[in-house]
């Protein structure tokens, strides 16, 4: 996907988050890890990889809430979380490589 498409998907997940928060009476602790990233769809200066990681993280949180309420299998949430962690490690690896190159 192109970065602009990822940003649109990210925004769609924000709308879904708001709907799920109302429907299932979620508190902000459910989305704490996502909120702490401080990467939102309007942050177009963020890298494509950062948006991808954020999308996977937000998707896995939404999937966990849905699986807790019997709407989808737990395996969906787990798969999204594992995929997100792989992307996070790749981002960290690239940042380390850039730091080592600059020093």
UniProtKB/Swiss-Prot annotation:
Domain of life, per lineage: Archaea
InterPro entries given in the database record: UPF0058, UPF0058_sf
Transmembrane segments: none
SUPFAM superfamilies: Vng1086c-like
Family per similarity comment: Belongs to the UPF0058 family.
The protein's name: UPF0058 protein MJ1205
Species the sequence originates in: Methanocaldococcus jannaschii (strain ATCC 43067 / DSM 2661 / JAL-1 / JCM 10045 / NBRC 100440) (Methanococcus jannaschii)
């Amino acid at each position: 996907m192109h970065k602009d498409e990822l940003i649109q998907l990210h925004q769609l997940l924000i709308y879904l988050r708001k709907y799920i928060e109302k429907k299932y009476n979620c508190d902000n602790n459910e989305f704490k890890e996502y909120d702490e990233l401080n990467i939102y769809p309007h942050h177009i200066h963020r890298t494509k990889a950062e948006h991808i990681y954020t999308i996977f993280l937000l998707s896995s949180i939404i999937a966990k809430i849905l699986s807790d309420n019997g709407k989808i299998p737990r395996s969906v949430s787990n798969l999204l979380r594992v995929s997100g962690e792989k992307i996070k490690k790749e981002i960290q690896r690239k940042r380390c490589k850039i730091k080592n190159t600059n020093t």
